[in-house]
Amino acid sequence: MSKLFLRILAASTIAVGFLALVSIPSARAKDEPVATAALTESDLAFLKKGLAKKPKDSELGTLKATAMMLALYSQNELTGSDAAKAAGRRDLALTIAAALEKKDFAAAKTALEGWATAKDGDPKKTVKLHEQHAFELSELMAQFSLGRSGGRHIEADLKAQAAKLTDVKLATELGGRVATIGRYAALMPAGDAVGPKKQKWDDLCNEMIKLGNDAAAEGAKGDRADKPALAKKLAAINLNCKNCHDVFKNN
């Protein structure tokens, strides 16, 4: 098997489609979201680092959101060949989120350490993830904040890579992460997203999902990725964020 084929195969794994969190009322929701192997690895590492010491209060929202992201990645794999394992990991991710909600950091760390050996769960069990453990929009969006503020540095990385794309792997991860955040956000509207503004929220979230998927799909090409095109896709995500904040100023 050639090294080129292996590189293409590895890159393609991040572009495999997965199911939506729940149905989102828009044609945009039919777009295939990106797969999760690289995102899962990154999120597990982030949680491990964050729980290596007692987290600061400013870090709690992002840590909890990261656990909820892991839950969604796993729930989206419930129709695969390892559905029972995916269900078990979804449940374990929710256990981590629940422990973080209670500030039981020892329990969160213990649950995280059991990720690789998670017990099988029930793939037929439906869980409305966005309704679990008092998950809030502010926690979801905290991931965009700077690392020193407890975030995942998403906004800063998006702007930097859009201005000068230097890291295709990072750009791919950013796209996948943005798409996943968009799927949650579509079901967690801002408090002032009512009346005509609710439709605006839906439109912006669905655009966010599509733009994230597009960036991740381009980045998944690895060495064959069109870097100028990928940078433009990241710039489009930045514009989507700006447009959202222009309407929903307190979110």
Residue positions per predicted region:
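Polytopic transmembrane helical bundles with strong interfacial aromatic enrichment
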Residues: A10, I24-K30
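Bacterial N-terminal signal peptides that target proteins for export
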Residues: M1-G17
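C-terminal segment of classical bacterial N-terminal signal peptides
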Residues: V16-S26
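Mature extracytoplasmic or organellar-lumen-exposed domains after removal of signal/transit peptides
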Residues: A29-N251
